[in-house]
């Protein structure tokens, strides 16, 4: 997928971003390089490769890996909501400010 200069200018217009011709040309080059890289990655045969939950596992030492998720604090929502003027179903009720 290759973009053209008119595509970059259209995207900038839709995003309400003002870009000069030089910036548009530079952005076009960068986007086309990015799309080329994506196409190369999509061409790689990944059948039989197990997806990784966290790719960082491949570069970090075992001692620095992400810790297991565990509850470390008790649920004190009811305690915190006792001082609220109005709550319902565990949510804080606030006055309507937008008409």
Swiss-Prot record:
Allows the formation of correctly charged Asn-tRNA(Asn) or Gln-tRNA(Gln) through the transamidation of misacylated Asp-tRNA(Asn) or Glu-tRNA(Gln) in organisms which lack either or both of asparaginyl-tRNA or glutaminyl-tRNA synthetases. The reaction takes place in the presence of glutamine and ATP through an activated phospho-Asp-tRNA(Asn) or phospho-Glu-tRNA(Gln). This is Glutamyl-tRNA(Gln) amidotransferase subunit C. One of its GO terms (biological process) is translation. The keyword Nucleotide-binding applies. Belongs to the GatC family. Keywords: ATP-binding, Ligase, Nucleotide-binding, Protein biosynthesis. GO terms for molecular function: asparaginyl-tRNA synthase (glutamine-hydrolyzing) activity; ATP binding; glutaminyl-tRNA synthase (glutamine-hydrolyzing) activity. Pfam families: GatC. It comes from Ralstonia nicotianae (strain ATCC BAA-1114 / GMI1000).
């Amino acid at each position: 997928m290759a973009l053209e200069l008119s595509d970059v200018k259209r995207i900038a217009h839709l995003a309400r971003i003002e870009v000069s011709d030089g910036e548009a040309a530079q952005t076009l080059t960068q986007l086309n390089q990015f799309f080329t890289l994506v196409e190369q990655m999509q061409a790689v045969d990944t059948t039989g490769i197990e997806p990784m939950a966290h790719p960082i596992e491949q570069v970090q030492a075992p001692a620095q890996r992400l810790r297991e998720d565990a509850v470390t604090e008790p649920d004190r929502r009811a305690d915190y909501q006792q001082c609220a003027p109005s709550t319902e179903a565990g949510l804080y009720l606030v006055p309507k400010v937008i008409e």
